[in-house]
Amino acid sequence: MDQTLIQEILEIVEQAAIASASLSGKGLKDEADALAVDAMRKRMNQIQMQGRIVIGEGERDEAPMLYIGEEVGTGTGPGVDFAVDPCEGTNLCAFNQRGSMAVLAASDRGGLFNAPDFYMKKLAAPPAAKGKVDIRKSATENIKILSECLGLPVDELNIVVMDRARHKDLIAEIRGTGARIQPISDGDVQAAIACGFAGTGTHCLMGIGAAPEGVISAAAMRALGGHFQGQLVYDPAIAQTSEWADMTKEGNLARLAEMGIADPDKVYEAEELACGEHVCFAGSGITDGLLFNGVKFEKDCTRTSSLVISNLDNTCRFTNTVHIKEDAQSIALS
C-alpha cells in the first residue's frame, strides 16, 4: 500500500457513509445498508488494485455484493485484502442514533484473519495497558490493572459493554468494582477504537460482539498501538442469540474445524487478527459518534467526518471533507 491508495480508501468509506446517511432516521436499516454496500463497491472498483473481500456481507450465496472472496478493483496494481462493514450499526442509522459509521480494514494480501461469522469475546484498552490487561483474566483483575496503568481511580473508569442479556453477569462484576458502565446498543468498533485515544472518556471495551467487526477493530488498534484481544465464541448458550437457533455447540465446532481453525479457544492478539506488514483502518461517520461527526447535508455541499489510521507512516488522520455539489453558490467554512 502507498499514500495514494490510503487516500482512495478514505474515499471508499466517505461514499458509503453519504449513501447510507441519506436514509438515516427513516427506519429503513436494510435499505440504508444496501445503499452503503453499493456505494462502497462502486468506489472500490474504480481503484487500480487487485482487491479481495475477506470479511464482507456474507458468503457468496448469501450476499449479492461485497461477499467473502469477491474481487474488487481494476484487476491491476497491488494485492489488497479488505474487511468491510459498509454500515456498522444499521439500527443506529435507521433511528438516527449515535455511533453508526462506514468502516473497513485493509492490508496486503493475507494480512487479515478470515474470521467466521461467529461471535467473539473482546477486550480493548489504551496503549498504556497493552500487554498488561488480558482477556483470560477476570473483569475485576483487568479493571485494577487498568486503573494502575492509567493512573486513574477505579471509580473514574468508563467500561463500554454492549447492552445484551448475555452480559448481565459481566455488568454486575464491573459495577461491583466501582467502575462505571457505558452501555451501547450496537456498533462496538467505534467504542473499541475510542479506547486507543486519550480524552474520549472511554477506557476499556469488554464483552461479546461479532467476530468480523473484531478484526476491523484489531486492525485499527494494531496501527494505533492499543490493546486488543479476541476469542471466538462458539457455544450458543454463551452467545445467547436467536441467530444460532438451529445450531449446536458441536455443530459450530465442526464449522470452525472445516475452516481450518484447529484451536477454537485460542486467544488472538491484534497482531494475529491483522498480521499484514501494512495495515490501515478507515471509518467515516454516518451519525455523530465518539470519534467523529456524522454526514451533514447542506444546500451546496455534503460534509463528512472521517478517521484513517495507518502503520505505513504511523499516522492517525482526522479528516473533514466538503463534497461540493454542482452549481454550488456558497460554501460555509464550517
From Swiss-Prot:
Its EC number is 3.1.3.11, 3.1.3.37. The keyword Cell inner membrane does not apply. Keywords: Calvin cycle, Carbohydrate metabolism, Hydrolase, Manganese, Metal-binding. Pfam families: FBPase_glpX. It is an enzyme of class 3 (hydrolase). SUPFAM superfamilies: Carbohydrate phosphatase. InterPro entries: FBPase_class-2/SBPase (IPR004464). Its cofactor is Mn(2+). The keyword Transcription regulation does not apply. Pathway: Carbohydrate biosynthesis; Calvin cycle. Catalyzes the hydrolysis of fructose 1,6-bisphosphate (Fru 1,6-P2) and sedoheptulose 1,7-bisphosphate (Sed 1,7-P2) to fructose 6-phosphate and sedoheptulose 7-phosphate, respectively. Belongs to the FBPase class 2 family. This is D-fructose 1,6-bisphosphatase class 2/sedoheptulose 1,7-bisphosphatase.
